[in-house]
Amino acid sequence: MNTVKTGMLLAAMTALFMGLGFLIGGPKGAMIAFFIAAAMNLFAYWNSDKMVLRMYKARQVDETTAPNYVGIVRQLAQNAGIPMPATYIIDNPQPNAFATGRDPEHAAVAATTGLIKMLTPEELAGVMAHELSHIKNRDTLIMTVTATIAGAISMLANFALFFGGNRNNAGGLIGTLALAILAPMAAALVQMAISRTREYSADAGGAEISGNPLWLASALQRIDEAARRAPNEAAEANPATAHMFIINPLNGRGRDNLFSTHPATGNRIDALRRIAETMGSRSRPWG
């Protein structure tokens, strides 16, 4: 996402936040919400990556503690022409991964123990290349900031449902209930629509970085099947971060529609196979 789109999204999130503030405290509540949102946006810009990593209890590793995993990421970063990101492992049986950070110079990737144990080196390279594509395209800022703001909107909406103090104005009780319910839904829809488009782009970019689209295609199929059998309790507790992962960690079986955080896995695999056909002899083995 470019800077303009990032700014537009943050403005929309701020407007939702202010609307909920208005429900709770009228014009003064909206003004307070504006300053809170501005501070939150600034805080998220600098710290949301650390928050997400802490949320999932990710531990940083290096080539001494996780040589194969870190070595793969290092080679892929060189292929992509970006700085080596910090590498983390999450102790979770569900195979999954995400990238975070405000720019390529301050980025991190995290993979679960389930992912590292299950995949072949080629499949792991396909997944991590996808995550590095997010970093290279500067998607990671919008991923982490929207997760932070959307979560805050959901919490404030719940507060507005019980403590909304402006119910005699601007539509009364019905207006209060409508905005308190619709605001988090709108925030979620923004996340979902952006996530689906971004995932296709990262799949294509990752195929170029790794050199073989079929590695990621194979990994996605295996991850999708395994993720349905392995719940991710941390993600269930923090659903606003679901769009950050390579596969929906909430075990959803939704199709490629308005309410899905990720494109249908089958559609992604088909797209990768088409890319493989066009790459032809350019596809190369790992290592």
From Swiss-Prot:
It is found in: Cell inner membrane. InterPro entries: HtpX_protease, Pept_M48_protease_HtpX, Peptidase_M48. GO terms for cellular component: plasma membrane. Keywords: Cell inner membrane, Cell membrane, Hydrolase, Membrane, Metal-binding, Metalloprotease, Protease, Transmembrane, Transmembrane helix, Zinc. Its cofactor is Zn(2+). Binds 1 zinc ion per subunit. Zn(2+) binds at H130, H134, E199. The chain crosses the membrane at residues 7-26, 30-47, 145-165, 170-190. It is an enzyme of class 3 (hydrolase). GO terms for biological process: proteolysis. Pfam families: Peptidase_M48. One of its GO terms (molecular function) is metalloendopeptidase activity. It comes from the Bacteria. The keyword Ubl conjugation does not apply. Its EC number is 3.4.24.-. CDD domains: M48B_HtpX_like (cd07336). The active site is at E131. It is a multi-pass membrane protein. Belongs to the peptidase M48B family. PANTHER family: PROTEASE HTPX. This is Protease HtpX homolog. It comes from Parvibaculum lavamentivorans (strain DS-1 / DSM 13023 / NCIMB 13966).
